[in-house]
């Protein structure tokens, strides 16, 4: 019975929304970074194979793609650390709220984590004649002093969410370009659905700013474009960009969940016990 009660008490302090958001964030970032990296490499191969024969015409594009790939590496590392930090903050604030409401009082961390939020010294302890501090409790006290500012985490998460919305919007651009190309290929494959001559249906990389206007040929038309759309390189790159877009959307949902949960916990900590809903 004691083991069962201990498990129940531990489960009470688990921030389920933060755990779900962390898993969603890691999955979304992994999908965005992995698929986005490979999709950029595929785009580079398609450009240099079909749209331009002069290296100087797409040299700048290669530098931009390489820069984006390095940015992707940084995004992956940052969100790995930031996700762990926000998950720790979720555990911290949930434990503090449960302690304030009298629902969950873990003996190992009540002296370190809780006093940081409540601003006072834990009950049963005085500044004089302190007892020897165990290693776990000392670690928790240090962690509590570091994580004891949920308002700052709300602000940081809000800023990161705004920045990620911009990244999410940018990830839709290549999906739009490839989708337009795919629609053009469908019109070429089924000429009865359009009154335009097949030879005039083209995909122009210069129109999207991918290549300079003096690039040659810069565009592919008619059956040549249809042949490109049927290649595994084009289809794989198109689907990778879609997967990266979905990963960016999942990461955005995770950040919004983080922000809502952190704001809720901070509000509850401010009013100290006026609400008993703290599963974030």
From Swiss-Prot:
Topology of the protein relative to the lipid bilayer: Multi-pass membrane protein
Segments in the Cytoplasmic topological domain: 1-10, 89-152, 270-280
UniProt cross-references to InterPro entries, sorted A to Z: Myelin_PLP (IPR001614), Myelin_PLP_CS (IPR018237)
SMART domains from the UniProt entry: PLP
A single GO BP: axon development
GO molecular function: structural constituent of myelin sheath
Compartments where found: Cell membrane
Main location: membrane
Residues with a covalently attached lipid (S-palmitoyl cysteine): 7, 10, 140, 142
Domain of life: Eukaryota
Pfam families: Myelin_PLP
Job of this protein: This is the major myelin protein from the central nervous system. It plays an important role in the formation or maintenance of the multilamellar structure of myelin.
Protein family (similarity comment): Belongs to the myelin proteolipid protein family.
UniProt-recorded name of the protein: Myelin proteolipid protein A
Originating organism: Xenopus laevis
